[in-house]
Amino acid sequence: MTIKTDVLIIGSGAAGLTAALNLAESHKVAVIAKGALGDSASARAQGGIAAVLEEGDSFEAHVNDTMIAGAGLNDVYVVEHVVEAAPRAIGHLIDLGVPFASENGALHLTR
């Protein structure tokens, strides 16, 4: 079987599918995965997405926690960017219809 595409994305995790969604507006995109599209490490992680979404939480705390979890090997500028972009990314995923866990009509937030 031959498939013609502008962009081939290998992997159906969060990064691959985000790239596919963004590129699909202007390119013909194909996604391939070694298993079912929903069978990625991202889908199996079930740990949620770390983001500052409520009062009393802070970007600084998330950056610090991430740096500690990464044994200080993380690029602090990348960590800061990801933490700052996370609330917008979650909003975008909600707009796309991603079914996040919720309680009483609000996102389920855990610590």
Describe each PLM feature range:
Residues T2-T5:
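Core beta-strand elements of the Rossmann-like FAD/NAD(P) dinucleotide-binding domain
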Residues V7-V31:
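N-terminal Rossmann-like FAD-binding beta1-loop-alpha1 element of flavoenzymes
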Residues K34-R111:
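Conserved N-terminal/central alpha/beta ligand/cofactor-binding core
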